[in-house]
């Protein structure tokens, strides 16, 4: 069967795995520039310098510099993240199509943030104080390939020009928040889950500790731990056993009433 020249050109645009050949340019070192055209959260103009890597999972995960600018104040800040991802499907739409020329020319891709089905960042109240934090998704970087999240506290003082960003990525419980985390707004608690297998998982519950000092009002304290284990303190095998510890004055106190073997 003969293949015409146009068909041969079309085939030349794809790799053997069926992906566009220009994906090879997206090696984690080549920048893609994106400007979101809508005002985000009613107050931010955002653009991104992104270094997607087509060889990672999920495809296009990569470092990025996310630049925020307030629309009503002379405030700008940049968040650097390692696993930014918009999703390669976005670039299959004609208005956001990307190709080798777009990449080589460093053309800015103008995109509506609201068009992204699974947004790479969002704003949400992560510590029950009624103020929204900046939350950046790390796609598939959590345990068992769940999404993990970076949390940044936005500090402002009413009737002043004060504006500050606090990186909470090394502060518990914020540092271990992922798609398995449970938030209880009634009790002001966050429960972290650590997957270790059928009977080797654990949970930590943190309770919000409010402060009269606004700039330090974001902390939690560990109040309960639950461990599931199949060995005792001597290292001997035992039936799957649940251990519940309450944290009192910094000490772990076993709650024997609700601890014990499980089915």
Segments the model singles out, each with a brief description of its role:
Residues 88-120, 171-181, 235-237:
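Repeat-based blade/solenoid architectures
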């Amino acid at each position: 069967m003969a293949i015409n020249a146009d068909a041969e050109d079309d085939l030349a645009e794809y790799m053997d795995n069926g992906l566009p050949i220009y994906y090879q340019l997206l090696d984690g070192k080549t920048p893609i520039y994106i400007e979101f055209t809508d005002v985000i959260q009613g107050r931010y103009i955002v653009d991104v310098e992104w270094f997607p890597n087509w060889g990672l999972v999920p495809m296009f995960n990569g470092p990025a510099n996310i630049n925020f600018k307030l629309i009503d104040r002379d405030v700008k800040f940049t968040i650097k993240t390692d696993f930014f991802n918009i999703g390669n499907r976005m670039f299959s739409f004609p208005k956001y199509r990307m190709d080798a020329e777009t990449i080589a020319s460093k053309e800015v891709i103008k995109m509506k943030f609201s068009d992204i089905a699974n947004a790479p960042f969002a704003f949400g109240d992560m510590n029950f104080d009624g103020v929204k934090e900046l939350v950046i998704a790390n796609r598939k970087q959590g345990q068992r390939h769940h999404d993990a999240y970076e949390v940044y506290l936005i500090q402002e003082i009413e009737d002043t020009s004060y504006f500050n960003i606090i990186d909470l990525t090394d502060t518990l419980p914020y540092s271990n928040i992922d798609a398995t985390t449970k938030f209880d707004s009634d009790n002001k608690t966050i429960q972290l889950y650590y997957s270790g297998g059928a009977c080797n998982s654990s949970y930590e519950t943190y309770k919000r500790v409010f402060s009269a000092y606004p700039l330090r009002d974001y902390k939690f304290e560990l109040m309960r731990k639950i461990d599931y284990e199949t060995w005792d303190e001597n290292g001997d095998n035992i039936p799957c056993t649940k251990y519940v510890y309450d944290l009192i004055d910094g000490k772990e106190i076993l709650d024997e009433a609700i601890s014990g073997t499980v089915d």
